[in-house]
């Protein structure tokens, strides 16, 4: 077999052990190099599977009782502009998207690739959005909780319990609050991906409305370019007027 053919063969995730044994006898350096690369990839995949299954430990407690459990997370607490977005996701027991993890650990491209797959494979997905005006009226913490409540209530199937990333959702359901839950639960991780992609899409839309602020790049966070635009043009209708330094800028404009 030619080395290029062997290279193509070893791209598969699972290969007949008999074939691997035969290739191990091949003394060509190129073949042995390909085998080493294959083994490393298999070890990485095995570790990924082990970690993925480990992030279902909380869900399994509920599944063992025949219960549906939803993961809840939010994104957009820290930006100076735009809404806070929450998502609630109920995953099936046979969910197997190994790359699902805390959205902060994934590239934008990976999140975008996983987003439609999560929507397709989940039992139910709900999204909640609280805009900057609500945030200014009731504070970011309470707006977070309302967005999470809205997300849970938007689920087409009602869960028996919730796994929540470090917060309590104001709904009448048993809840387990997990610190850094998006790194401990696949359900919360899936929710974090949905919320992040959904919010990023909203900020892309706002970038077209307010091109001077580069919301498609900074997602509303206080980057250098964003702050310079704020100083030059002032706040937009989507800025959080109670957040510093926006609040100080608004105060200065009023004083003028």
From Swiss-Prot:
InterPro entries (alphabetical): RNase_HII, RNase_HII/HIII, RNase_HII/HIII_dom, RNaseH-like_sf, RNaseH_sf
Record's cofactor remark: Manganese or magnesium. Binds 1 divalent metal ion per monomer in the absence of substrate. May bind a second metal ion after substrate binding.
Presence of the UniProt keyword Metal-binding in the record: yes
SUPFAM superfamilies per UniProt: Ribonuclease H-like
Reported cofactor(s): Mn(2+); Mg(2+)
Enzyme Commission number(s) from the entry: 3.1.26.4
Residues noted as binding a divalent metal cation in the record, renumbered to the chain: 73-74, 165
MF (Gene Ontology): manganese ion binding; RNA binding; RNA-DNA hybrid ribonuclease activity
Localization annotation: Cytoplasm
Catalytic activity line of the entry: Endonucleolytic cleavage to 5'-phosphomonoester
The protein's enzyme class: hydrolase
Assigned GO CC terms: cytoplasm; ribonuclease H2 complex
Pfam families: RNase_HII
Superkingdom, taxonomy of origin: Bacteria
Gene3D superfamilies, A to Z: Ribonuclease H-like superfamily/Ribonuclease H (3.30.420.10)
RNase H type-2 domain residues: 67-255
Metal-binding as UniProt keyword: yes
Family label: Belongs to the RNase HII family.
Name of the protein: Ribonuclease HII
């Amino acid at each position: 077999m030619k080395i290029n053919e062997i290279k193509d063969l070893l791209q598969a995730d699972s290969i007949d052990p008999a074939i691997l044994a035969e290739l191990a006898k091949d003394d060509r350096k190129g073949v042995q190099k390909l085998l080493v690369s294959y083994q490393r990839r298999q070890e990485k995949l095995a570790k990924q599977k082990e970690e993925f299954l480990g992030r279902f430990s909380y869900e399994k407690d509920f599944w063992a009782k025949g219960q549906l459990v939803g993961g809840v997370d939010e994104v957009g607490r820290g930006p100076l502009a735009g809404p806070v977005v929450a998502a609630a996701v109920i995953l099936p027991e046979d969910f197997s998207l190994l790359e699902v993890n805390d959205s902060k650990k994934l590239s934008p491209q990976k999140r975008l690739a996983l987003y439609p797959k999560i929507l397709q494979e989940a039992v139910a997905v709900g999204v909640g959005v609280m805009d900057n005006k609500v945030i200014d009226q009731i504070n970011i913490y309470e707006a977070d909780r309302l967005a999470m409540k809205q997300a849970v209530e938007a689920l087409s199937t009602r869960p028996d319990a919730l796994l929540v990333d470090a917060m309590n959702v104001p709904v009448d359901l048993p809840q387990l609050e997990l610190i850094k839950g998006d790194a401990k639960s696949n359900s919360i991780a899936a929710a974090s991906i949905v919320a992040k992609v959904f919010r990023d899409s909203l900020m892309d839309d706002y970038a077209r409305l307010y091109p001077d602020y580069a919301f498609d790049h900074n997602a509303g966070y206080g980057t250098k370019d964003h702050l310079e635009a704020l100083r030059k043009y002032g706040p937009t209708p989507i800025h959080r007027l109670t957040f510093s330094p926006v609040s100080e800028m608004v105060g200065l404009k009023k004083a003028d």
